[in-house]
Regions:
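Conserved small/polar residues in nucleotide/adenosyl-binding loops
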Residues: 352-354
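Juxtamembrane and boundary regions of transmembrane helices in multi-pass small-molecule transporters
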Residues: 150-159, 191-223, 330-340
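Membrane-core helix-loop-helix motifs of multi-pass transport proteins
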Residues: 127-143, 147, 159-205
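Membrane-embedded hairpin module used as a gating/binding unit in multi-pass transport
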Residues: 196-273
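Structural signature of hydrophobic alpha-helical transmembrane segments
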Residues: 21-30, 99-114, 162-167, 254-262, ...
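Transmembrane helical segments that form the transport core of multi-pass membrane transport proteins
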Residues: 244-332
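N-terminal alpha-helical transmembrane segments of multi-pass membrane transport
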Residues: 1-78, 92
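Entry/N-cap segments of selected transmembrane alpha helices
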Residues: 24, 124-149, 303-329
Length: 354
């Protein structure tokens, strides 16, 4: 009877043994991290709609490594490094997630869908009522972006790479994805993965930052409203969204697809198109977010993430979000003194996304 090569029969185990201890340890770590993300998502500590598919994708991609026909290690999910058109078209007929990745993720379409959905949830009336407070606190919440840029450059990253990783400080996953695609495409996979991993963990960690930097007496402030807020009707909000979209696209054309998507969502919300609103705010937003989490998990292949620059990206991403959190809280303190005590500093942290 011919001897059976169990390394070939069970290639996930065989490639784990043959890939070397460092790569094997990285795969095991990512598999365990995937289980942790699923658990934290199930418990509601992290966002389940992103973290559960992301965790499962991390497990599958690092367990499902096999030997490809050319003798190299690979998988049947997707290959984000393909650039040759013929090779890409061939792979799209084999790797089941390659069409989704190529046609929605790598061109930023999925980020635009998410922004469109967010727009349907956005009430621009608050920005119209309190423009100074909104913009000031949002600016404070970008402290991590401003400070991380020169730090990253000093650590040896190029200006484009530094700007891409600094965008993590804005706590806006789709914007990080879009920016890294435009400025540092060779690093957009690790930067985007780092961004979403940290964003998920940050939402669990920011409450502790609040407790550390804001005393309980200030956290418990109940703000008094001296006069009733002005209510703006739908036509004013729609006109405001259209004008703001035009201004931002004019000033920053490189990000115009995201601005357009966001304000299109606002327009759908304010124009009373109920069926379109239900679709964009429901299936489109949640479906895109779910697929985004799944693709991010599948991109967490140990072979892809073992880049010498990854350690720098991990440190800089964490630093950017930490500094942005501190900046938001400092902005809250400044508003507390401007309002003579009638302002809860915790609000400063909540405006980091704006």
């Amino acid at each position: 009877m011919e001897n059976i090569d169990f390394g070939i029969l069970f290639q996930g185990i065989g490639t784990m043994i043959e890939s070397g201890w460092f790569l094997a340890c990285a795969r095991v770590f990512l598999i365990l991290l995937g289980f942790l993300l699923i658990y934290l998502g199930w418990k509601g500590i992290l966002e389940p709609m992103v973290m559960i598919p992301m965790g499962l994708g991390m497990i599958a991609i690092n367990c499902g490594t096999l030997i490809m026909p050319d003798g190299n290690l690979g998988n049947l999910f997707l290959d984000p490094m393909l650039s040759d058109t013929d090779e890409l078209m061939n792979t799209m007929q084999i790797d089941f997630l390659q069409p989704v990745y190529t046609l929605t993720f790598s061109n930023g379409l999925i980020a635009c869908f998410v922004f469109m959905g967010i727009g349907t949830l956005l009430d621009v009336g608050f920005l119209l009522q309190k423009p100074f407070a909104s913009l000031f606190l949002a600016l404070c919440g970008e402290l991590g972006t401003f400070l991380t840029l020169p730090i990253a450059n000093a650590l040896g990253l190029s200006a484009q790479e530094s700007a891409s990783v600094a965008m993590v400080g804005g706590a806006d996953g789709p914007m990080v994805l879009f920016t890294s695609l435009a400025l540092a495409k060779h690093l957009f996979v690790p930067i985007t993965v780092v961004a979403y991993l940290y964003l998920g963990l940050t939402y669990g960690g920011y409450p502790y930052l609040v407790k550390l930097l804001i005393p309980k007496r200030l956290r418990s402030i109940k703000m008094t409203v001296k006069k009733a807020p002005k209510n703006y009707d739908a036509k004013v909000k729609l006109a405001f969204a259209a004008v703001l979209c035009a201004v931002l696209c004019f000033l920053f054309p490189v990000a115009s697809p995201l601005f357009f998507s966001l304000f299109l969502g606002v327009a759908v919300r304010e124009s009373g198109m109920k069926h379109i609103y239900d679709f964009v705010s429901g299936p489109l937003l949640y479906g895109s977010t779910f697929m985004l989490g799944l693709l991010l998990g599948v991109l967490c292949d140990a072979h892809l993430l073992l880049d010498p620059k990854i350690l720098k990206l991990l440190i800089l991403g964490m630093l950017a979000l930490l500094l942005s959190g501190i900046g938001g809280i400092l902005g809250g303190y400044i508003m507390y003194y401007i309002k003579k005590g009638n302002y809860n500093p915790v609000i400063g942290l909540s405006l980091i996304h704006i």
